[in-house]
Amino acid sequence: MAKISKRMKEISAKIDAEKKYPVSEAFDILRDVSSVKFVESVDVSVALGVDPRKSDQVVRGASVLPNGTGKTVRVAVFAKGPAADAAKEAGADVVGMEDLADEVKKGNMDFDVVIASPDSMRVVGQLGQILGPKGLMPNPKVGTVTMDVAKAVRDAKAGQVRYRVDKAGIIHTTIGKVNFTSDALKQNLEQLLTDLKKAKPSVSKGIYLKKVSVSSTMGPGISVDFSDLNI
């Protein structure tokens, strides 16, 4: 059995695993137990009342967090003509078509998000085996295949997070950094949960938002009471 580090023992002593903490208190605890030399992300896990084995219960989508994620996001856009010009004006870091595809094939992928106009998918479609495993393949369900590439670029730059339910029925994503104020993190969490509720499959029965936990990059999960959130 692996030994529990002294740091983790000290952290665990401050957290009641059986308790659901008020959201702001949970964020305070994350800051209190953060002892690493970098600014940790604040991550959230949301257990949903869905059966992801069934295709009509796979929850996926995107949420634009009002206070961003605290990360600098590099965006690549596959587009041409006016759409390419609009993407550049919106702040895209890389814009192209076949030339951008060639760079991807060479392994030159210095970007975090890929957006594509519908007419560029003939080019992007050939890159599925490269972009797919990295989670970069554009998809209309999360707004990364779109006629309005400029808006997609602005959303990505503003702090859009994408999510997809895993095999256990859980959504994992980030809602900011530990140096965000509790109010900023709370607003981001509220936006995410609001968007998740909108994405509820019509066939999902019973309790949909079952459990919400927050954690820092190197910290333990803390179950939160989300009943008083504005969602």
Curated annotation (Swiss-Prot):
PROSITE patterns: RIBOSOMAL_L1
GO-annotated molecular function: rRNA binding; structural constituent of ribosome; tRNA binding
InterPro entries registered for this protein in UniProt: Ribosom_uL1_bac-type, Ribosomal_uL1, Ribosomal_uL1-like, Ribosomal_uL1/biogenesis, Ribosomal_uL1_3-a/b-sand, Ribosomal_uL1_CS
CDD domains according to UniProt: Ribosomal_L1
Origin superkingdom: Bacteria
Keyword terms, alphabetized: Repressor, Ribonucleoprotein, Ribosomal protein, RNA-binding, rRNA-binding, Translation regulation, tRNA-binding
Listed GO biological process terms: regulation of translation; translation
Cellular-component GO terms for this entry: cytosolic large ribosomal subunit
Protein purpose: Binds directly to 23S rRNA. The L1 stalk is quite mobile in the ribosome, and is involved in E site tRNA release.
Assembly and oligomerization: Part of the 50S ribosomal subunit.
Entry's family note: Belongs to the universal ribosomal protein uL1 family.
Name of the featured protein: Large ribosomal subunit protein uL1
